[in-house]
Every structure is written in C-alpha cells, then in structure tokens.
C-alpha cells in the first residue's frame, strides 16, 4: 500500500489527532518522523522495516546514521530526523531524572541506568553525581571499553565530581556477557575509587554492575 492509499483513519497523524499520541505504535511514531515513503512503498512499510531491524526500540539509540541508512528507503535526511528525535528524547529524559530523582537505594539508581546500559555491546563506565540530599544533579559516561585499573582513573571521575559540586557519586558499568558477577579488575577499580573519594571528601556510594535484566551492588555485597 502506497502513502496515498492509506485510509484517513490509518494515517499516523490523523490517528494521533483523533486518539492521542499514546495510541500510536512504534512503527507509526517512526512514520511521523520520516514523513514520506517512496514511489513503491508507503511510509509505514519503511517505518516497520526500521523497527524490525532492531531487537527492541531501545537499541535504536545506539545506532549510527550509517546503520539507519542500511534500511531500504532511508537516506541521510530521514536517518538524521530519526537520530534527532532520539537525541531529543534522551535529553528530555536526563533533565527529568535530574529534577525529580532521589536515590535512596541501589534499585533507585539501577532504574535510571538499566535501560541505557543493559544491552550495550561494549563496556561503558557511567557515573551519577548527587548532592547532599541524594538528588541526581548530573550523569555521564566516563569511559567506553574494557574496564581495568589503568583506564578507569579516579582522577577523571572526581575531577568531574568536583566541577559539578557533587557530595557523592554512584558508579556503574555493564557486562556485555549479561553476567554481572564482578571480576578482580572490577574490585580493584572500586577500591581505588573509594580511596580517592575519601581523600577528596566525595563519597563513593556504590559501584553497580549491570547485566541482562539483573545487577550486583558491590556495596551491598560488602566488597568495599
């Protein structure tokens, strides 16, 4: 079915106006973003192809512009629109989290980072920076790649913490294997971070390892 053959009630824009944005499927949302189909395919057909390319919609946030362009019917203009929409959503999410979230326990923090870290194919070392009320004031990925003591240097972590006037930090990294069990390097990095935090007066509240839909809090396990 081509774009001009889609009935009025089936068009994503009309569906949004009649029933609200929540009524749209992921494919329909993408169709609204890319706007047009091709001579031979409707915008919904192309949008559905994009959704099917990824295991879940969350994985789209890690795709490059080249990966989107591998989808038949997607050129640089449409790929750019998709990436812009994803980036805007990420920025809104971060601002909302920073304004509202108080971290009272590891589970509170995991809810913030699990969607971002759980399905990555490389290790990412990520930090939350908190004020004296345990509110998140900033967050950032500090390192990407294999976690070891020579790469994850406390200096880089606490330089940013001092710049943001953080009272404490929580650190996270993912295990692409899905198994969150800590390695000896994980424990060494944690020890060095905790010691550095004591020196500069910024507490390391926890170092949490993220697996596939599960995690391990090194603080809860008594590793530091």
Swiss-Prot record:
Pfam families, sorted: RadC, UPF0758_N
UniProt KW keywords: Hydrolase, Metal-binding, Metalloprotease, Protease, Zinc
PROSITE patterns per record: MPN, UPF0758
Transmembrane segments: none
Coiled coil: none
Gene3D superfamilies membership: 5' to 3' exonuclease, C-terminal subdomain (1.10.150.20), Cytidine Deaminase, domain 2 (3.40.140.10)
Keyword Protease found: yes
Cross-referenced InterPro entries: MPN, RadC_JAB, RuvA_2-like, UPF0758, UPF0758_CS, UPF0758_N
Superkingdom, taxonomy of origin: Bacteria
Domain MPN: 102-224
Residue numbers covered by motif JAMM motif: 173-186
Molecular function, one GO term: metallopeptidase activity
One BP term from GO: proteolysis
Residues holding Zn(2+): 173, 175, 186
PANTHER family named among the record's database cross-references: DNA REPAIR PROTEIN RADC, UPF0758 PROTEIN YEES-RELATED
Family assignment from sequence similarity: Belongs to the UPF0758 family.
NCBIfam families the UniProt entry points to: PRK00024.1 (NF000642), radc (TIGR00608)
Protein name: UPF0758 protein LMHCC_1020
Originating species: Listeria monocytogenes serotype 4a (strain HCC23)
């Amino acid at each position: 079915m081509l774009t001009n053959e889609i009935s009025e009630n089936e068009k994503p824009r009309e569906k949004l106006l009649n029933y609200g944005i929540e009524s749209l499927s992921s494919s329909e949302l993408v169709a609204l973003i890319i706007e047009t189909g091709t001579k031979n395919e409707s915008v919904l057909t192309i949008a559905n192809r994009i959704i099917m390319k990824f295991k879940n919609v969350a994985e789209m946030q890690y795709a490059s512009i080249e990966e989107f362009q591998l989808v038949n019917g997607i050129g640089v203009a449409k790929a750019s629109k998709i990436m812009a929409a994803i980036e805007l959503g990420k920025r809104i999410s971060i601002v909302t989290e920073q304004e509202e979230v108080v971290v009272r326990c590891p589970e509170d923090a995991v809810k913030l980072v699990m969607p971002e870290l759980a399905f990555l194919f490389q290790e990412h070392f990520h930090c939350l920076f908190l004020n004296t009320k345990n509110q998140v004031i900033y967050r950032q990925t500090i390192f990407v790649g294999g976690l070891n003591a020579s790469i994850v240097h406390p200096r880089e972590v606490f330089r940013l913490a001092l710049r943001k006037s953080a009272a404490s930090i929580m650190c996270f990294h993912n295990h692409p294997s899905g198994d969150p069990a800590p390695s000896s390097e994980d424990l060494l990095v944690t020890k060095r971070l905790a010691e550095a935090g004591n020196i500069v007066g910024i507490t390391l509240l926890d170092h949490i390892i993220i697996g596939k839909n599960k995690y391990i809090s090194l603080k809860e396990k008594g590793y530091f």
